[in-house]
Each structure stands twice: as structure tokens, then as C-alpha cells.
Design a protein with these regions (language model features):
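Core catalytic lobe of class I
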Residues: 1-145
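S-adenosyl-L-methionine
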Residues: 147-166
Length: 166
């Protein structure tokens, strides 16, 4: 991260998992949250995007009533089995989590970066929402899951170019 000065941390979002996995060791608190970092590229005078008015209607859960200012804590269940058809990843995020952040912080045609692509959820959702995406994943063992997820055999989708850089 030698160019960290080019990145602005805009906000953090706490993902509260109402159906978190139990703590089977009974030696610490049950882990029921994760943190997302919303960052943007600094420079050239361009401001980051935040669709404030839209977030009041697109984000609704028990912590965020529809029509109200959106908080940075979102209650979203764990990734359902149906979203793991391309394969399992130990930290896969639910589509709804990425849908919210991408709709809130970008417009159609914008580019979304995920430096920890994992199973490809961010790129998958970005494509569904007509955004471009750049994903980085250092673990080669997850490439088959990413490829399967981003190149589904469906006639309704455009082909997604996937470039593997080693």
C-alpha cells in the first residue's frame, strides 16, 4: 500500500449478522459483525459518489427504517446457500450487502474495486447493476469459483472478460 495517500476512507459500514454462526468453543463472544471500508481515490478534484436520497429508499432493515437517513450499521443475514452455487468461500458476502454499497456509492458505468475478491460477489453484483469492476484475489484456489460465478451459462448476460494476472 505504498500509495495510501491517494486513498480517502469515506466511511466504514458495520455488517450485523442476525443469524451469525454460534461460538462452539464458548470461550469468547459470538462474532456477529464485520466491517466494510468505503474508500475512494483522492485527487483531480473529483468528489466521490454518495446517492444520499436513494439510500433512504434502497436500504431497509430493522436498523434502517425506509425513508429515514441511513445508518452505517446494516442487519443482513449470512450468505444463503443459493448464492454459493458456484462454490464455497470461507468469507463469502451476501449479494444484498454488496448491492447496497454499490448502489449507494456509484452510478451506472462507474468502476468498483475489490482488492479481496474472494468468490467474486462484488464483481457479480457490479455487473448486475451495470458497473465495471476490478477484482484482485491472491489465492489461485478461488479462481474456478470466480470464473464460474462471473461466466454463468445464461443467455441474458453479456460475456464478462476475466483476466488472470499472476
Amino acid at each position: 500500500m505504498q500509495h495510501l495517500e491517494d486513498v480517502k476512507i469515506n466511511n466504514s459500514i458495520v455488517w450485523f449478522k442476525p443469524n451469525a454462526q454460534p461460538n462452539i468453543t464458548c470461550r469468547f463472544f459470538t462474532e456477529s459483525t464485520e466491517h466494510l471500508i468505503w474508500a475512494s481515490k483522492n485527487g483531480n478534484g473529483k468528489k466521490w459518489k454518495f446517492n444520499y436520497e436513494a439510500t433512504k429508499n434502497l436500504i431497509e432493515d430493522r436498523l434502517n427504517p425506509k425513508g429515514k437517513q441511513t445508518r452505517n450499521v446494516w442487519a443482513i443475514p449470512l450468505t444463503p446457500k443459493a448464492e454459493k452455487r458456484a462454490g464455497k468461500h470461507p468469507t463469502q458476502k451476501p449479494i444484498e450487502l454488496l448491492r447496497r454499497i454499490i448502489l449507494a456509492c456509484s452510478d451506472e458505468g462507474d468502476t468498483v474495486l475489490d482488492p479481496f475478491l474472494g468468490s467474486g460477489t462484488t464483481s457479480f453484483v457490479a455487473k448486475m447493476l451495470k458497473r465495471n469492476s476490478i477484482g484482485i484475489e491472491k489465492e489461485n484456489k478461488y479462481l474456478p469459483i470466480i470464473k464460474k460465478r462471473l461466466n454463468p451459462p445464461q443467455k441474458t448476460w453479456d460475456d464478462i472478460e476475466l483476466e488472470v494476472i499472476r
